[in-house]
């Protein structure tokens, strides 16, 4: 007779006796199928699944799509007067990464941590460090809130732009026709600041996306530029069985229709053998021209789209939700009203950490799932180059050994220079495994600004939302403990606090004999007055009082 898990967990002490030690190891799915958790989320509480389209439902192939955007932007710059030589540049995917900051004053690309400390600094293709860096950044630090000067290149659409900025700065710095200055460059009596150059690039990128031929060239060759996954119809059909599904994209209807038709263009439906269905049938609500992040605030007028012409019908839509109708504009409040859902009922899935994740989290309280396509490469390096990580751990052990028997009375100064050089070399090798700018999430042991934003705003994240296919809709995504250094570096061994020298070490915060304390207080106060405060001391809670990030709703549990 087998024992159920619930029976075993009635008495925690019985669990090891009923299981072999191998069974106690936590089961984890394949790394490339995993969904990673920052804040616990119970899937059975999600009533609506929301999607962005670009780089979420429709993942653009890299580097083909970035190369196309890069070429079109360069052509636009040349058409407005930039040098013809720029047409010789080709997109190099090994250089840029997301989350870099462009300094519009000095023309530098910066990789920073959450607090603005510099991790990497590049002027064009030249990586600068040491005294050269301190001339422009005396404390190796930037004020991130100075948005007039510092621009964060956070999206996947920013990758071609990031590399183009490096190309331009390098060209104008090194081309003999131009005189390089600290804040720009000169051509005779003409001066161009890096700020002006940056604005030209921003305008060119916007022109390519909204007025140029980027979308036209994309739909002309969808197989070349868009990833098509046969598991997409299956996952969305399963989501629709347990809740409502909506699409909210900034793209217009004509482009959305062509992309989505391609993504769902299979001879069968959700499963082999089932009949083919149009892409619209997988959604309860379709909303285009969303204009995120404005969409998560005041939004825009909600209008109806004529799906035959792609044009908008006149007037504001004020009716109830109707299946088969495509809407334009609106706001996140509109979605909640039409679907009959409130903030935490909705899991919104997108790739844009600001436009999709931050705003939906801060303004609406929606649960958030961030799609990070680069995570596949990050996991590959993490697993394939494990020897580098292991060597760093070994070097830390060697370093600790040198100081093992030394305290403040020691005059001995161990020579750690060779270990330090090796640590720097191994750390550099590790960084270069990700690309010239290193990992999206860290430089050495320090986390990047992008990593801190992911941890702060994304409840869940993965390389692809398709990974949800490998979890049941009753799953509890439980966040792992985030350990501080005094927890991650100290073994779970007994320490006698009475032997510690700290004056607070013997302060017992776990239990107090309240009855004895009450008696003593009563002896002291009874002669003064028979009147006592209603409560002389707090009682130790007998039930759970702390929020443990288990996505629990106490009121709902009580109602049940």
From Swiss-Prot:
Gene3D superfamilies: HAD superfamily/HAD-like (3.40.50.1000). Broad specificity cytosolic 5'-nucleotidase that catalyzes the dephosphorylation of 6-hydroxypurine nucleoside 5'-monophosphates. In addition, possesses a phosphotransferase activity by which it can transfer a phosphate from a donor nucleoside monophosphate to an acceptor nucleoside, preferably inosine, deoxyinosine and guanosine. Has the highest activities for IMP and GMP followed by dIMP, dGMP and XMP. Could also catalyze the transfer of phosphates from pyrimidine monophosphates but with lower efficiency. GO terms for cellular component: cytosol. InterPro entries: HAD-like_sf (IPR036412), HAD-SF_hydro_IG_5-nucl (IPR008380), HAD_sf (IPR023214), Pur_nucleotidase (IPR016695). This is Cytosolic purine 5'-nucleotidase. Its EC number is 3.1.3.5, 3.1.3.99, 2.7.1.77. Residues 550-560 have a biased composition (Acidic residues). It comes from the Eukaryota. The active site is at residues 52, 54. It comes from Mus musculus (Mouse). The lineage of its organism: Eukaryota, Metazoa, Chordata, Craniata, Vertebrata. Coiled coil: none annotated. Its cofactor is Mg(2+). It is found in: Cytoplasm, Cytosol. Belongs to the 5'(3')-deoxyribonucleotidase family. Keywords: Allosteric enzyme, ATP-binding, Cytoplasm, Hydrolase, Magnesium, Metal-binding, Nucleotide metabolism, Nucleotide-binding, Phosphoprotein, Transferase. It catalyses: a ribonucleoside 5'-phosphate + H2O = a ribonucleoside + phosphate; a 2'-deoxyribonucleoside + a ribonucleoside 5'-phosphate = a ribonucleoside + a 2'-deoxyribonucleoside 5'-phosphate; IMP + H2O = inosine + phosphate; GMP + H2O = guanosine + phosphate. The modification Phosphoserine is found at residues 418, 502, 511, 527. One of its GO terms (molecular function) is metal ion binding. IMP binds at residues 52, 54, 202, 206, 215, 249-251, 292. The gene is Nt5c2. Binds 1 Mg(2+) ion per subunit. Mg(2+) binds at residues 52, 54, 351.
